[in-house]
Amino acid sequence: MHLKKYLLKGLHRLQKGPGYSYKELLVWYCNNTNTHGPKRIICEGPKKKAMWFLITLLFTSLVCWQWGVFIRTYLSWEVSVSLSLGFKTMDFPAVTICNASPFQYSKVKHLLRDLDELMEAVLERILAPEHSDANATRTLNVTMWNYTPLVLIDEQNPHCPVVLDLFGDIHNGSASSSPAPARSCTVHGCKVAMRLCSLNGTVCTFRNFTSATQAVTEWYLLQATNIFSQVPQRELVEMSYPAERLILACLFGAEPCSYRNFTSIFHPDYGNCYIFNWGMTEKALPSANPGAEFGLKLILDIGQEDYVPFLTSTAGARLMLHEQRSYPFIKDEGIYAMSGTETSIGVLVDRLERKGEPYSQCTVNGSDVPVRNLYSDYNTTYSIQACIRSCFQDHMIQNCSCAHYLYPLPRGERYCNNREFPDWAYCYSHLRMSVAQRETCINMCKESCNDTQYKMTISMADWPSEASEDWIFHVLSQERDQSTNITLSRKGVVKLNIYFQEFNYRTIEESAANNIVWLLSNLGGQFGFWMGGSVLCLIEFGEILIDFVWITIIKLVAFAKSLRQKRAQARYAGPPPTVAELVEAHTNFGFQPDVARPGPDPGTYPDEQTLPIPGTPPPNYDSLRLQPLDVIESDSEGDAI
């Protein structure tokens, strides 16, 4: 009951309003505010009133402008970078090593036989189109050549270049390896290009190269990709270099290790790669002390004599340092170690800590990235490299209907090959050169908020020396093959020393350049400096704004009611009827004394007594008027709120 009464009083108070007009409210505010200036506007003479009004208006505008600048600066989410140094025992990084050649030529030669013969014929026609000493003629399988051939472009007349096919004598899918007919261009006057055509052959593009070496290497790699994509990965692993052949010796600190301490993964570019201290199944190994004596020492046998001649032109080992449980993108971030040398790598650690939303677009674990991570099968952490490659593979599947061999294969998809997807090379070339595709993937992928980078200082020296070369190679050969029949040579061994230079690590951390404390202090400082105000002054100003809105709403409601009343008066002309008029409109004429009512003939019932006729009508109260139902009378306690 009390709550209902209290709510009713509150409703009456809302309907009544502040009880001031606009002018009275402004005068009250100027007299009572703690802000300097408004009080002088109403207390001084006319000239000073105008002066103080202009000054107050100017400084108010200046404060609002400064507030806008500070708020815009705060909403720009700028960061400041701090660099700090630390010293502690650190976990040794994961080390990935690969051979520069992905496969042993002795094991893949049967797959590349036709391609190698075609490659030799291509080189003959490029290098000696008219003066070849090849007397024997052999038949070549040019089925793969028909999909992506190499051509010579004669640009002696730049306005009308001439395209010459290297195998102009192709008939029924085969070609002779003898030189082609004399051409009007030589190797100095022509450029080698790769012709890529769509499925029906109506649209063709030419990928130009500045050197014939680049052209034939890219062409051979494209054809080899087509071949290896049709071989099961289990067989490819067997054709690559096994760990027991690649890793001859291993030492971590003072503890010996072997190839069994490495985790094997298959990389499409480098075949079998081996990761030390990956941390997938065991705890990461710490480094006891900085210095070369407490790092990882490896001796590798790259087996250069068994390299694929046209697939790999670089000899050595490829290695990369990375975090535990992260996938090694060794093609993009790795370095080469040259054969016949001892490569020493000193490591310094940088830790990056980025601010997340809204300061940057980084992600903690990649769960908020709208790209399917194709490297999740390796159970590795998120990285922007994995995201970009997964995004490219998705676009490859959408545009070319097949997946590229160099990237993980999604479930239910197939790798591209010439037999099932004849125009995949044309589609892949366009997609790889597409700027829109790269921008799409870069915008969709995010950097990792926390990252560790390993800065390397690399030095090299010949190893072994001429004085110790014989006995070292004999000992290594005996340890590897348990016999001295096979002797290693300088061109096939690589020695690596990987160690921490020092235990000092750098932490590069982002922090908010402008936080909420900075914003409030600057807003308050500007307001206090220019107008002598504080937070209470803002509350006072907010109060008067609420009162202004309150009065405006009451006036609008009253105006709406007056419009409704005017419409009602226009519909029913004249004053409303009185109670007496309403009663007369419904009078029962049986009660009227001056109206004779027909009755029975007196002669019929002579002895019947005649009763008086009741004719007293209700009184006519002309003073009673009908009251509108929507009018609510305020009680005497309405102002008590």
Curated annotation (Swiss-Prot):
NCBIfam families documented for this protein: ENaC
Membrane topology per record: Multi-pass membrane protein
Protein name: Epithelial sodium channel subunit beta
Organism, as annotated: Canis lupus familiaris
Cystines in this chain: 98-273, 185-190, 197-204, 250-257, 362-449, 387-445, 391-441, 400-427, 402-416
Region (Disordered): 593-624
Main location as per UniProt: membrane
Annotated catalysed reactions: Na(+)(in) = Na(+)(out)
